[in-house]
Amino acid sequence: MQQSLLTFEQVYYTYPGTQQSVLNGITLQIPQGKRCALIGRNGCGKTTLFSLANGLYKPQQGRVYWQEKALQYDRKNLMQLRQKVGLVFQNPEQQLVASTVEEDISYGLCNLGLPIADIQQRVTQALVEFELTELAERPVHHLSLGQKKRVSLADVMVLRPELLLLDEPTAYLDRPQSRNLMAMLNKIYKSGTTILMASHDLDLVYCWSDWVFVMDAGRLILEGKPEDIFSQREILDSIELGLPPIYEIFITEELATKEHNSENFRRRILQFFC
């Protein structure tokens, strides 16, 4: 049986000062060892779900579990949770807190009280892995958006989380920057980290993910393998998501039949687009 890292059980959440719930009894399990994607139109509750997963918010009803243990919201347990569950915001400005790149990456480690030698070793390794060595002493406000996103990713990964949450990681990046970031995410995944990524880029979701969650109005309405999710055209159209253009190509019979082997055709298209 597939083990889940993080489980939401009948979770409700309403922001203070509002009456409408953002999450409406959502139940969801994030499977260990998978590249997961979360899709849904704006306002469906994706970002709120991430904030609950990281312990930034606490459910008003329902429970959140880490490896079958209910989350505890005292300071000690939240610090432990945030080492295990890393969260990268869509806007990197929300989590860049120090003066230079090197200082920013070391910030979380210093808060953990690790020995200086360990901090230096981890920071040096992160600078190399995220191609930031030449930027180590540069002020973070002098960086490009793509560089800031890499720093925010390094900030989280230096803590060695088991689960990485990413809110629209490729938003506002050009194609080369997106490819570079996705290559880094693939390395992170291959090193053993489970990933859950929220994205409006349905082509990326179809190409990259092993498992897809579909949210609408604060609820989970579909989950499954990408090919199974995107076969549900009627449901996806009803919530204004539609299908990935690349998937539309795959299901166009006229194109598929031009290849003797439709699987070879699929691989060629994936290589071109992804």
Curated annotation (Swiss-Prot):
Q: Which SMART domains match?
A: AAA
Annotated positions binding ATP: 40-47
Q: What Gene Ontology terms describe where this protein resides (cellular component)?
A: ATP-binding cassette (ABC) transporter complex
**The enzyme's E.C. designation:** 7.-.-.-
> In Gene Ontology terms, what is one molecular function of this protein?
ATPase-coupled transmembrane transporter activity
Q: Where in the cell is it found?
A: Cell inner membrane
Coiled-coil blocks: none
One Pfam assignment:
ABC_tran
Record's keyword terms, sorted: ATP-binding, Cell inner membrane, Cell membrane, Membrane, Nucleotide-binding, Translocase, Transport
How does this protein sit in the membrane? Peripheral membrane protein
Report the sequence similarity comment from the record.
Answer: Belongs to the ABC transporter superfamily.
Question: What does the UniProt record say this protein does?
Answer: Probably part of an ABC transporter complex. Responsible for energy coupling to the transport system.
Q: What is this protein called?
A: Putative ABC transporter ATP-binding protein alr3946
Origin organism is Nostoc sp. (strain PCC 7120 / SAG 25.82 / UTEX 2576)
